[in-house]
């Protein structure tokens, strides 16, 4: 969608969105962000606007809403009582822009540390201004109110054991700190702190050309980097009104689904280790290593591939790719079968995963959870089916869903999704068309070396694209794709230049992790560990 669908006065925002939710079934809040128009070429009613992105209950329609904020107060009503997913989303917007959400129960920083001064995504904040954190926050300002809301008195709180799980703990699967209060082995309250891997992705995007941002997207979910490349490139291409070639679409499907398999292999393999099943880990990591060899041969890198280009791809498939790919797919299928054979009738595995870390469907939707974590709760939401792109509507594959939303269902959904991805890849290879991998668009695609050295037009085009970047039409746009962990979205604002005015990434992990503390409260600490592993939090993605 180019430009926002609705412009709402801030005084009417809450009532209007409440109506959209209750009458028009826009029951999912996908994301919240803000735009600082301080240096925008057009005149705007005020400096800051807050952006809300909603999706309806059929998963087929989304709407982008803008509301300008009073420059004197910088206040706007919180939507937390309408959507639980507004919690961390509004905290992030406050953290990055200084917008105050009136009525939010815990409006404090979430990505930047507690000693940080200022708001880094404001246009008058210099990107070179670093700020060091010198002491750890004890998080008692969140823990004590949470315990009191559960009926604990001060003297009872003093008797609880307070424990930090992370940020540097093997079970945290990344730089996540969970501060828990415990009675025996049971978690009574949990406070999650993130930001340890925050690199300022969105601030960096504002200082680079559209093409230079692609390597940064690799570092979001580094377990399936190419899916990030695809999601970002797709967003910019849609802003440009470009449709990539049929061959490029099919190759993106092939490599994207292979990346999905890699992500699921890592998730389930790591979960097996937490459960004590090291043999299963090697069964799943062996085909992963084969796939990395294939990607290295294709893209020149094993992990951070930077494979897509705006308008196409960096390289075409090499000779013999089809044979190498089939070997990888067979290895994946064997690894999955071998791992499953060890746990299918394993009593210990069933006891550790069934009815553990349960996520109900309505809870998942209220909290903005998507992807396998949502499907495991019984909700058949997959953007490849609901909002198909790149010809996904022409592929024969099933949307895998669970029935209980527990650790067992989440793992089994990922195992079966790997099978479905191999099915998609084989269909795509069978129907792979010939032709170019990049569109013919001199203002988008770099010219060949022959043209650069052979004629002045090619030389000038190469110079302008390299130094000035692709000139994207002025506008505001939200694009999405079905990444390995759920809906990966990019909200981009263009001022018509070769650098984006704003880029906001909607990381699926961010919303799953925001809900994690509510899921594990009342469970055993050991169960909280396997719950975390089964939800597949990637620090590079939620911290950005």
Swiss-Prot record:
In the N-terminal section; belongs to the complex I 30 kDa subunit family. GO terms for cellular component: NADH dehydrogenase complex; plasma membrane. GO terms for molecular function: NAD binding; NADH dehydrogenase (ubiquinone) activity; NADH:ubiquinone reductase (non-electrogenic) activity; quinone binding. It holds the Pfam family Complex1_30kDa. It comes from Aliarcobacter butzleri (strain RM4018). Disulfide bonds: none annotated. Its EC number is 7.1.1.-. It is a peripheral membrane protein. PANTHER family: NADH DEHYDROGENASE [UBIQUINONE] IRON-SULFUR PROTEIN 2, MITOCHONDRIAL, NADH-UBIQUINONE OXIDOREDUCTASE 49 KDA SUBUNIT. The keyword Isomerase does not apply. It comes from the Bacteria. InterPro entries: NADH_Q_OxRdtase_suD (IPR001135), NADH_quin_OxRdtase_su_C/D-like (IPR037232), NADH_UbQ_OxRdtase_30kDa_su (IPR001268), NDH-1_subunit_CD (IPR026662), NDH1_su_D/H (IPR022885), NiFe-Hase_large (IPR029014). It is found in: Cell inner membrane. This is NADH-quinone oxidoreductase subunit C/D. Residues 1-138 are annotated as: NADH dehydrogenase I subunit C. Gene3D superfamilies: Cytochrome-c3 Hydrogenase, chain B (1.10.645.10), NADH:ubiquinone oxidoreductase, 30kDa subunit (3.30.460.80). NDH-1 shuttles electrons from NADH, via FMN and iron-sulfur (Fe-S) centers, to quinones in the respiratory chain. The immediate electron acceptor for the enzyme in this species is believed to be ubiquinone. Couples the redox reaction to proton translocation (for every two electrons transferred, four hydrogen ions are translocated across the cytoplasmic membrane), and thus conserves the redox energy in a proton gradient. NDH-1 is composed of 13 different subunits. Subunits NuoB, CD, E, F, and G constitute the peripheral sector of the complex. Keywords: Cell inner membrane, Cell membrane, Membrane, Multifunctional enzyme, NAD, Quinone, Translocase, Transport, Ubiquinone. The keyword Iron-sulfur does not apply. It catalyses: a quinone + NADH + 5 H(+)(in) = a quinol + NAD(+) + 4 H(+)(out). Residues 161-544 are annotated as: NADH dehydrogenase I subunit D.
């Amino acid at each position: 969608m180019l430009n926002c669908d609705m412009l709402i006065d801030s005084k009417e925002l809450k009532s209007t969105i409440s109506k959209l939710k209750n009458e028009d079934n826009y029951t999912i809040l996908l994301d919240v962000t803000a735009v600082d128009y301080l240096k925008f070429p057009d005149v705007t009613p005020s400096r800051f606007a807050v952006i809300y992105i909603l999706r309806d209950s059929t998963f087929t329609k989304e709407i982008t809403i803008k509301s300008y904020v009073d420059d004197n107060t910088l206040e706007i009503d919180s939507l937390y009582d309408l959507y639980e997913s507004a919690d961390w989303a509004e905290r992030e917007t406050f953290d990055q822009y200084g917008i105050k959400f009136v009525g939010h129960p815990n409006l404090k920083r979430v990505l930047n540390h507690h000693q940080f001064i200022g708001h880094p995504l404001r246009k008058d904040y210099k990107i070179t201004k670093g700020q060091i954190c010198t002491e750890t926050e004890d998080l008692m300002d969140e823990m004590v109110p949470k315990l009191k809301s559960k009926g604990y008195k001060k003297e009872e709180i003093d008797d609880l054991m307070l424990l930090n799980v992370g940020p540097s703990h093997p079970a945290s699967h990344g730089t996540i700190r969970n501060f828990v209060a415990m009675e025996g082995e049971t978690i009574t309250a949990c406070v999650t702190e993130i930001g340890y891997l925050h690199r300022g992705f969105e601030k960096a995007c504002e200082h680079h050309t559209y093409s230079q941002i692609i390597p940064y997207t690799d570092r979001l979910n580094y377990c399936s980097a190419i899916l990030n490349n695809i999601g970002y490139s797709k967003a910019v291409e849609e802003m440009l009104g470009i449709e990539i070639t049929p061959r490029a679409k099919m190759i993106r499907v092939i490599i994207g689904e292979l990346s999905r398999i890699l992500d699921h292999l890592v998730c389930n393999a790591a979960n097996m280790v937490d459960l004590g099943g090291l043999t299963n880990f090697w069964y799943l990591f062996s085909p992963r290593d084969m796939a990395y060899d294939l990607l290295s041969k294709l893209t020149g890198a094993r992990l951070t591939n930077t494979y897509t280009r705006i308008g196409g791809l960096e390289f075409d498939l090499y000779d013999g790719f089809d044979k190498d790919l089939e070997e990888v797919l067979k290895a994946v299928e064997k690894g999955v079968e071998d791992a499953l054979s060890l746990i299918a009738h394993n009593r210990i595995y069933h006891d550790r995963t069934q009815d553990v870390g349960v996520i109900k469907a309505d809870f998942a939707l209220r909290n903005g959870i998507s992807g396998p974590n949502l499907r495991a709760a019984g909700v058949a939401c997959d953007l490849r089916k609901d909002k198909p792109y790149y010809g996904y509507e022409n592929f024969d594959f099933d949307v895998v869903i669970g029935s209980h939303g527990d650790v067992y269902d989440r793992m089994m959904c990922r195992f079966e999704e790997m099978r479905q991805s191999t099915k998609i890849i084989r269909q795509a290879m069978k129907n792979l068309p010939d032709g170019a991998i990049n569109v013919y668009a001199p203002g988008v695609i770099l010219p060949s070396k022959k043209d650069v050295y052979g004629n002045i037009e090619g030389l000038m085009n190469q110079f302008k694209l390299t130094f000035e970047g692709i000139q994207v039409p002025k506008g505001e746009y939200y694009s999405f794709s079905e990444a390995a962990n759920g809906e990966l979205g990019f909200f981009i604002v263009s001022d018509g230049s070769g650098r984006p005015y704003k880029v906001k990434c909607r990381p699926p992990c961010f919303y799953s992790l925001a809900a994690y503390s509510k899921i594990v409260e009342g469970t055993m600490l050991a169960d909280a560990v396997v719950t975390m592993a089964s939800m597949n939090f990637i620090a590079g993605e939620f911290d950005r």
